[in-house]
Amino acid sequence: MDRRLSKKEEERIVNELNKLQMIEMVDTSVNLTNKCFQSCITNFRIRKLDDEEQLCVYKCVEKNMFFTSALNNHFMKLSNEGMF
């Protein structure tokens, strides 16, 4: 029995996957913000970040973006090899 999805079902699934992907991206962004804030921001007496805090936040975000990119590349490689 050939059970293919109709065009409408396919569109619905793609839309749901896109929504889930957006939610995941927002969650990742919020988690990264919280992680870097907790790791880097130490002085709450002044409104602006000092130079040390700014550098820490920059390095924290850069490190996490590099890791995420490397992880995505690895998953793409596995997917292209048919392993994922």
UniProtKB/Swiss-Prot annotation:
Any GO MF annotation of the entry: metal ion binding
Main location per the UniProt record: mitochondrion
Disulfide partners: C36-C60, C40-C56
Membrane topology: Peripheral membrane protein
UniProtKB keywords: Disulfide bond, Membrane, Metal-binding, Mitochondrion, Mitochondrion inner membrane, Protein transport, Translocation, Transport, Zinc
GO biological process, any: protein insertion into mitochondrial inner membrane
Database matches in Pfam families: zf-Tim10_DDP
CC terms in the record's Gene Ontology section: mitochondrial inner membrane; mitochondrial intermembrane space protein transporter complex
Membrane spanning residue stretches: none
Motif Twin CX3C motif per record, residues: 36-60
UniProt KW Zinc keyword: yes
Cell compartments where the protein resides: Mitochondrion inner membrane
Highest taxon of the lineage: Eukaryota
InterPro entries: Mito_inner_translocase_sub, Tim10-like, Tim10-like_dom_sf
The UniProt record lists the keyword Transferase: no
Assigned protein family: Belongs to the small Tim family.
Subunit record text: Heterohexamer; composed of 3 copies of timm9 and 3 copies of timm10, named soluble 70 kDa complex. Associates directly with the TIM22 complex, whose core is composed of timm22. Interacts with the transmembrane regions of multi-pass transmembrane proteins in transit.
Role played: Component of the TIM22 complex, a complex that mediates the import and insertion of multi-pass transmembrane proteins into the mitochondrial inner membrane. The TIM22 complex forms a twin-pore translocase that uses the membrane potential as external driving force.
Domain notes for this protein: The twin CX3C motif contains 4 conserved Cys residues that form 2 disulfide bonds in the mitochondrial intermembrane space. However, during the transit of timm9/timm10 from cytoplasm into mitochondrion, the Cys residues probably coordinate zinc, thereby preventing folding and allowing its transfer across mitochondrial outer membrane.
Name of this chain's protein: Mitochondrial import inner membrane translocase subunit Tim9
Gene source species: Dictyostelium discoideum (Social amoeba)
Phylogenetic lineage: Eukaryota, Amoebozoa, Evosea, Eumycetozoa, Dictyostelia
